Regions:
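Condensing-enzyme catalytic core of the thiolase-fold
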Residues: 1-186, 191, 202, 207, ...
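Charge-dense polyanion-binding interfaces
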Residues: 219-229
């Protein structure tokens, strides 16, 4: 998987030490999307912090709605690994990341178990989100251009929040293999190699050793070694 962007912020002053700030959470998500340079509608799964608390979860949903600014007609599954393995405290963020990376690798959405009975204050019917309750193929979102569907890569947003108001959000994307490009070199072209060293003395020594190696090994042929350099 590829990390497209990540951001952190803090909720600032709230009604209590453990009370989240939906405005700060929404601003964080918007900033992470901006840094990733991807549209909100391209996110086809959200891994929520989702501690299962009566107050925190509705506030997080409010922050997600603020951050993604979806139309209500757009649907995006959400889940939380905490419903499956519990709250790992300091390791909860990396657990969420590992979960989503494995989902991207296998192109599957996995259920958040023990979540059949939802907090009534979530009001998910008034949002573009729904809880992922079953194991199924991960279908990416798409955009319509002159009636034609163009699918986005599978992308996910991952939230992880601290008890004292610290917030983090990461956007990751599935890895797509790129076709290998056969690069051919010849002696008629010039190529620029970049070298660095601690100081000029070491730089000149390094350049001299490299030049000797090139003359011995490459002769007049440019090959894979040239690409490495």
């Amino acid at each position: 998987a590829k990390v497209l962007s990540s951001s952190i912020n803090h909720g600032g002053k709230t009604n209590g030490y453990t009370v989240p700030n939906p405005v700060a959470q929404g601003a964080l998500i918007s900033e992470t999307l901006r840094k990733a340079k991807v549209p909100a509608e391209s996110i086809s799964y959200v891994e929520a912090h989702g501690t299962g608390t009566a107050l925190g979860d509705p506030i997080e949903i409010s922050g997600l709605v603020r951050g993604f600014k979806y139309n209500v007609t757009e649907i995006c599954p959400i889940g939380s690994v905490k419903s499956n393995i519990g709250h790992l405290e300091a390791a909860s963020g990396i657990a969420a990341l590992i979960k989503v990376v494995l989902m991207l690798k296998n192109k599957k959405l996995v259920p958040s178990i023990h979540s059949e009975t939802l907090n009534e204050n979530l009001n998910l019917s008034e949002t573009p989100f729904y809880i992922q309750h079953k194991y199924e193929d991960w279908i990416p979102t798409y955009k319509l251009t002159e009636g034609r569907k163009t699918y986005y890569p599978r992308r996910a947003g991952i939230s992880s929040f601290g008890a004292g108001g610290s917030n983090s959000h990461v956007i990751i994307e599935e890895y797509s293999e790129q076709p290998e490009v056969d690069i051919k070199f010849d002696s008629e072209h010039e190529f620029a190699f970049v070298f660095s060293a601690e100081n000029k003395e070491y730089l000149y020594k390094y350049l001299n050793k490299t030049l000797i190696w090139i003359n011995k090994q490459l002769k007049d042929t440019y090959n894979e070694e040239t690409i490495v350099l």
